[in-house]
Amino acid sequence: MKKENNYISTDVNHKKLIFGVVIIHICFLIIKNSGITDILKEKNIFYGVLINMIYQLTLIIMIGVAMKQYLITSFKKFKADRISVNIKRVLAGVGIAFLLSCIAGIIEMTVCSNISVPANQSNVNGYFVDYPILAVIMSVIMAPFTEEIIYRGILFRVFSKYGELCAVLSTGFLFGTMHMLSSFGNTNILLFLCQWLDYFLSGILFGFIYKKYKNIWINVSIHGTWNLIGSVMLLTKIMLTK
């Protein structure tokens, strides 16, 4: 089994930064989905984009300072593999993600008579309509990096003390739940569970990928490519409906 890089610095300040990254992530999602940011977005959707950009940049800076050596070491190992090998890994990961998404979609269509767009996705769609370039940057580059660092790079390590399978399941559960916070109380329970399942399965997949390769950049590459495909499809749909 591949050994994970020991990226947790002995520097107390760095440990505080890593802890702060997780806390800021949780607090931001709670505030974002409480309706407070919706008031600003109703005035101007750019405020929503701006808040998200500031949030992502803050996390990226904190992660860069606290986990610099881990990121550099992992990237060197990622670069050491042949490009063709990494491409195959990304394509395999995206292929499995597509299969899991199809399974979740079939279950949703079978179980739920009323199909609607998850609230999380609705917000993203609005950004793509008005600010497509910024939306792509956030969706394809920023979000995959910060989410993979938080769920696989930090929390996976925490839960792996109880076994790597526990880490995969726990981070998958948290990944799915955090993406569905905005739907709590806003939809029927069956629809909520079906939509949550899609994110949960994605989280489980990313967890197993990290368990196998122990390299965060492989996760970021697969996550980013998956989001890129979704972004292209969404932008194409927007262009065709104009």
What are these regions (language model features)?
Residues 16-70, 119-126, 134:
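Alpha-helical transmembrane segments in multi-pass membrane proteins
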Residues 1-11:
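Short, Lys/Arg-rich, polar N-terminal cytosolic tail immediately upstream
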Residues 42-47, 72-143, 185, 240-242:
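Juxtamembrane helix-loop-helix connectors linking adjacent transmembrane helices
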